[in-house]
Structure formats: structure tokens, C-alpha cells
């Protein structure tokens, strides 16, 4: 059997729009062969049947297309052994599966790392999720005794390095006939923690901004882009707007988004020492981005998974809890959270149905503990209880 020409190899979990359009695109442009891992058999078959797909970047100044090649796809449900071998010989493992799915991909990654030859440099594991510390979370699952025997954790850094990251790119719902092609905005930011690679070079991936202190980037992104996007979507849904763009044409919703981002900007500038003018300009840029008419993003898509988005470290409760502890204004974040609590029984969104059940069958205090992860000692707790009481009262009136 003829030897392949050596190319760098990356395994990416999650062959959805962000995986194909953002992460794999960067890996491809940096000279990696990309191995997609997914449980969607139709998607895996389509990728293996097609030698290429297009990534279409849209912006106010027009569109740009690039072609992605040099990839394969593996069904992680049915071809685990093949996937383990690919991980054991890859330079990089990335994922964009959603924070709730990390625990399901951890066992196979653990097996791949465990099989890795000591002659190879450590594999770089980078989770590309909208969550603070997602790679740390994935690493905890991987190192769990169920997935990695405790005696195999000795010198683990010789086999794997785990780097947290912050990703920022809006990938809207795709056209029904798009196939494998992905449309997304031109703007991107991918910031990764350099500190796990102090004694070695980090992976050579063009477009990554390697930093020594990631938290300011993660919180600035989550509490500006995701807070702003979701605020527009939830207020828009309640006011029967169809897209985020439509919502932001409404002056009242525009004002709600502006006020929510004033709340979070206060936290970001005070906590991380970010210049107020720089944060103001960042906010202006973000509002322009989420107002992009070329990204026809339905409010139902942006608002989906309200239970996750109302959780303790997420875009509303996370910043509001810190602001409340310091006696600072978080009223616009509470208003946005109220709209998220009203996002119930939305077609195609399981979490919105689950939220409706929780709201219908629990006392307000228990809802806040269960959904938001807050305890009674926190200053935000009674404020969110009031929000839940209001929503429940309206539901009883209907």
C-alpha cells in the first residue's frame, strides 16, 4: 500500500453549519485534512459522496465564496473504532456540538487519546462552543474514571493539551436547498488560550488569536454578542417579529437591546479593565452585525434552547448575578430574561416545551433554582422570582 503524502490532520465533532462553515474552513485553509465526526448518517453520507462544498460569506459589501476540500466523514455511532484511530493520530481535535452534547463525545475522544503513541506530540483539544470554559468541561468528562482509568492520567499532558476558546461568528439558518454549502457572516473571531502550550508550539491554525488570558474575551463575546442577539430574538418573538433583522427595525426592541448591553458593558469594563470607549465601539459593531439584513435569522432559531440560555453562567443570569451582587443595574437583563421565560411551546424546540412544563408545575422559587441555578443567598434571586411570578400570573390569566 503506497504511503500517503503526510498532511496535518484534525478531527472535528459536529458536521453542522458551524463545523463545516467556520471551524473546518479555518482548518482547511491551514493545511489540515479534516475528519468530520457526527451521528447524522445522511450528513455523513452526503459529505463522503461530495469531494467539496462551498462556504459563502455575506456582508454589506457583497458575498465571497470559498471551496472546502480534503475532508472525510465518519459516523461516530457506528464506526467508533475507525474514529478512535483517527483521534490517536490527529494533531488537533475540535468540536461544535453544543455544550449539552460534550458528555456524549468524551468517551470516544478519551479512547483516542489513550491509544496515542508516546512518540507523537500531544493532541490539541479545543471545544468551539458558546459556553464559558467548554474545553475544561469536555476535559473533565474525558478524564472521568468511567472514560479514562485513573492510572492512565499520569503524564496525561504528554498525550493531550486542552485549550479553552471563544468563537464568534453568526451562522444563520440555511436555505432549504443549500445542501452542504454554508452561508455565514464575513466577521469572525476565534480566540484560544495559549497557556496549555507553554512548552511547545500551539497548533498552526490561521485566524486563531492566541492569548494568555481568555476570560475577558469569552465574557465580552458572550455578554455582548449572545446577550444582544438573544435579547432581540426573545423581545422579537413576543412582539411577533419573524427575524432578528425585523425585530431590530422596531425602535422599542432596539432600545431594549441597547439597555441590556449597557448593563453588560458596565460589568465588562469594570471587571476586566476594558476601555469604555473600546467597549462602546464593540457594542456598536455587534448591533450592526446582528442587524445584517443578509442574515435572515428567524427569532425562533436564535431563541431556541431557553433552558440553557437562562442557566447560571449564560448570557442573562451570568452577568445579572454579578451586577446584582455589586448593587448595579441589571433591569434590562431581567426584562430580556422575562421574555425568555415566555418563550414556551415553540414548534421544533424541545427546551421551550420543557420550560412550559416547569413553569406550570413549580413554585417561582423552585423555578429559579432549577432553571437559573441561583440560590436564595444571591441578591439576584428575589428579582428573578418576581419575573417568574409575573410570567406565571399571565399564563394563569390566559
Curated annotation (Swiss-Prot):
InterPro entries: 6-PGluconate_DH-like_C_sf, 6PGD_dom2, Mannitol_1_phos_5_DH, Mannitol_DH, Mannitol_DH_C, Mannitol_DH_N, NAD(P)-bd_dom_sf. GO terms for cellular component: cytosol. It catalyses: D-mannitol 1-phosphate + NAD(+) = beta-D-fructose 6-phosphate + NADH + H(+). The keyword Nucleus does not apply. One of its GO terms (biological process) is mannitol catabolic process. The keyword Aminoacyl-tRNA synthetase does not apply. Keywords: NAD, Oxidoreductase. The active site is at 221. It comes from the Eukaryota. NAD(+) binds at residues 10-21. Signal peptide: none annotated. Its EC number is 1.1.1.17. One of its GO terms (molecular function) is mannitol-1-phosphate 5-dehydrogenase activity. Monomer. Belongs to the mannitol dehydrogenase family. Catalyzes the NAD(H)-dependent interconversion of D-fructose 6-phosphate and D-mannitol 1-phosphate in the mannitol metabolic pathway. HAMAP family: Mannitol_dehydrog. This is Mannitol-1-phosphate 5-dehydrogenase.
Amino acid at each position: 500500500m503506497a504511503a500517503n503524502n503526510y498532511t496535518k490532520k484534525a478531527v472535528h465533532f459536529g458536521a453542522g453549519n458551524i463545523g463545516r462553515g467556520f471551524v473546518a474552513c479555518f482548518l482547511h485553509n491551514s493545511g489540515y485534512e479534516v475528519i468530520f465526526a457526527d451521528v447524522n448518517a445522511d450528513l455523513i453520507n452526503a459529505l463522503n459522496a461530495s469531494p467539496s462544498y462551498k462556504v459563502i460569506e455575506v456582508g454589506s459589501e457583497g458575498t465571497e465564496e470559498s471551496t472546502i476540500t480534503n475532508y472525510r466523514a465518519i459516523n461516530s455511532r457506528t464506526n467508533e473504532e475507525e474514529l478512535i484511530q483517527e483521534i490517536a493520530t490527529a494533531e488537533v481535535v475540535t468540536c461544535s456540538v453544543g455544550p449539552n452534547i460534550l458528555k456524549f463525545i468524551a468517551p470516544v475522544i478519551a479512547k483516542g487519546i489513550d491509544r496515542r503513541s508516546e512518540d507523537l506530540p500531544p493532541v490539541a483539544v479545543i471545544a468551539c462552543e458558546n459556553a464559558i470554559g467548554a474545553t475544561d468541561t469536555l476535559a473533565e468528562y474525558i478524564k472521568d474514571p468511567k472514560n479514562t482509568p485513573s492510572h492512565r492520567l499520569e503524564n496525561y499532558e504528554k498525550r493531550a493539551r486542552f485549550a479553552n476558546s471563544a468563537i464568534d461568528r453568526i451562522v444563520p439558518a440555511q436555505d432549504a436547498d443549500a445542501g452542504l454549502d454554508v452561508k455565514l457572516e464575513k466577521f469572525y473571531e476565534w480566540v484560544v488560550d495559549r497557556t496549555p502550550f507553554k512548552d511547545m508550539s500551539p497548533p498552526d491554525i490561521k485566524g486563531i488569536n492566541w492569548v494568555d488570558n481568555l476570560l475577558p474575551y469569552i465574557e465580552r463575546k458572550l455578554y455582548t454578542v449572545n446577550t444582544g442577539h438573544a435579547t432581540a430574538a426573545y423581545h422579537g418573538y413576543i412582539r411577533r417579529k419573524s427575524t432578528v433583522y425585523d425585530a431590530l427595525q422596531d425602535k422599542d426592541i432596539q432600545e431594549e437591546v441597547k439597555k441590556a448591553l449597557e448593563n453588560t458593558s458596565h460589568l465588562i469594563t469594570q471587571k476586566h479593565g476594558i476601555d469604555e470607549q473600546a467597549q462602546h465601539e464593540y457594542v456598536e459593531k455587534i448591533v450592526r452585525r446582528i442587524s445584517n439584513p443578509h442574515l435572515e435569522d428567524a427569532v425562533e432559531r436564535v431563541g431556541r434552547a431557553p433552558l440553557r440560555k437562562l442557566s447560571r453562567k449564560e448570557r442573562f443570569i451570568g452577568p445579572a448575578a454579578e451586577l446584582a451582587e455589586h448593587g448595579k443595574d441589571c433591569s434590562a437583563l431581567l426584562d430580556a430574561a422575562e421574555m425568555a421565560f415566555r418563550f414556551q411551546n415553540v414548534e421544533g424546540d424541545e427546551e421551550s416545551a420543557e420550560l412550559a412544563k416547569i413553569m406550570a408545575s413549580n413554585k417561582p422559587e423552585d423555578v429559579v433554582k432549577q432553571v437559573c441555578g441561583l440560590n436564595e443567598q444571591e441578591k439576584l434571586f428575589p428579582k428573578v422570582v418576581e419575573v417568574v411570578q409575573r410570567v406565571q400570573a399571565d399564563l394563569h390569566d390566559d
